[in-house]
Amino acid sequence: MAQLAKFDVPEELTNKALEALELARDTGKIKKGTNEATKAIERGNAKLVLIAEDIEPAEIVAHIGPLSEEKKAPYIFIKNQKELGAASGLGVSCATVAIVDAGKAAEMVQDIAQKLEALK
């Protein structure tokens, strides 16, 4: 498996990101799937991008990290694509999700973004 993550994310922060995703899903707006997330990042709409680490082949999501950095969108790696899919409200696994409107999770997303910046 290719190593996608450029930095280690504490499990506590990963769990907080999944919690923020669930809240944003219910009170805001999210984009599910690599194509939708890519469009949100390119348009500058992504507040937080969640990328599954266990994607095969890794090339499917390899562009997300560099694109997020270019567009100044915070991104975090989630260990398991099934967890990401479940938090997105999908019954299947998901490679990438972008939070476009955080809704009631706005403060959480901002806090996560600041902590991610400190990790890099």
Swiss-Prot record:
Keywords: Cytoplasm, Ribonucleoprotein, Ribosomal protein, RNA-binding, rRNA-binding, tRNA processing. Belongs to the eukaryotic ribosomal protein eL8 family. GO terms for cellular component: cytoplasm; ribonucleoprotein complex; ribosome. Multifunctional RNA-binding protein that recognizes the K-turn motif in ribosomal RNA, the RNA component of RNase P, box H/ACA, box C/D and box C'/D' sRNAs. It is found in: Cytoplasm. InterPro entries: Ribosomal_eL30-like_sf (IPR029064), Ribosomal_eL8-like_CS (IPR004037), Ribosomal_eL8/eL30/eS12/Gad45 (IPR004038), Ribosomal_eL8/Nhp2 (IPR018492), Ribosomal_eL8_arc (IPR022481). This is Large ribosomal subunit protein eL8. The gene is rpl7ae. GO terms for molecular function: ribonuclease P activity; rRNA binding; structural constituent of ribosome. Part of the 50S ribosomal subunit. Probably part of the RNase P complex. SUPFAM superfamilies: L30e-like. One of its GO terms (biological process) is translation.
